[in-house]
Amino acid sequence: MRKFTPKFVPRRKNGPVEEKDVDERVKIEFDVESQKKWKASRPKPEIKLTASGPFALGPNASSSGTGRPIGSVYVPPPNVKNEEKDDALSKLAASSGHDEGHDEDMVDILKLRELNGQEQGKTDIGGKDLLVPIITDRMLPESNDEKLKHHAESAIHTTVINKEDEEQERVALDLQSLAQHLGLTEQEGMEDHFKDQMVLMQFPDKLPRFMGDADVDPVWPSSEVKEEEAGEKTDVEEKKDPDKHGRENGNIDDLTSLPYPAFHPPAGQIGVLRVHQSGKTTLEMGGVNFVVQSGSDCLFLQEIAVVDYDSKRIWNLGSFERRMIVSPDF
């Protein structure tokens, strides 16, 4: 089988350039001037739209909207045959006239049937003056259920707003009382701020003996003298000392929930508190030096109370502002 080999043709370097023949029809078709001519000669079609009746819009509409006035004669458009039967709706509008009010867009069905020649009796229509709306742009009246629903929604909205206002007032009062307790409010001076404040000092479990002239076990009056008239005898009534009879079981009388304290500090001065120039605070008590340091604040409220075991009463002295830790300086 012989193999196909294309013939090599040398490229023309010099000589006239070949031009392709242009089709004259294509040239004329895309000519702008000729295109304008046949576009301008094309006639525009005339569209004639006619309508009549109560639902028609335009010059032939018989309703009370824009267009032909009520009671005018119906004029058919050109090239349209005139209808044989008369426009009953236009007669009805001309006879009834135009009244200002809600009956502007209403049609009386009974009169309309009489003008059209229809017999009444096929449909039972209750009421003599039955009006049917055709075209209206008015708002429909709300029913009783809708009114009650709107009143309920407005009442709920008002209640929610009142609850939110009460909650905001409560939060504002809480923040104000907390700021006063923490001392964040504006004070007249620093002296007034730190005046009459109690400080809680936490001591170790064991303390040194107190040295001094104070009586460790003072004697309290155990008798009561009643004043009587002059010349008569005086009766002395002895009263039991609760300190002597209540220390055996650790309780006083029947107060099982209030234990009697076993430690009785002496009356008088128990130590000396020194504040150094460097800012260090020490406490000398019983010949032992203690270091006083600031403690951490608690997140809960702490108050000081004094308990009277005899009268079963408690006195609240208030809350302390600062907490100090006392530890021995070895």
Swiss-Prot record:
Classification of source organism: Eukaryota, Fungi, Dikarya, Ascomycota, Taphrinomycotina
Name of the molecule in the record: DNA-directed RNA polymerase III subunit rpc4
Keywords from the named record: Cytoplasm, DNA-directed RNA polymerase, Nucleus, Transcription
Subunit structure: Component of the RNA polymerase III (Pol III) complex consisting of 17 subunits.
Compositional bias segments (type: Basic and acidic residues): 15-36, 231-250
Compositional bias of kind Basic residues: 1-14
Entries under InterPro entries matching the protein: RPC4 (IPR007811)
Stated role: DNA-dependent RNA polymerase catalyzes the transcription of DNA into RNA using the four ribonucleoside triphosphates as substrates. Specific peripheric component of RNA polymerase III which synthesizes small RNAs, such as 5S rRNA and tRNAs. Essential for tRNA synthesis. The RPC53/RPC4-RPC37/RPC5 subcomplex is required for terminator recognition and reinitiation.
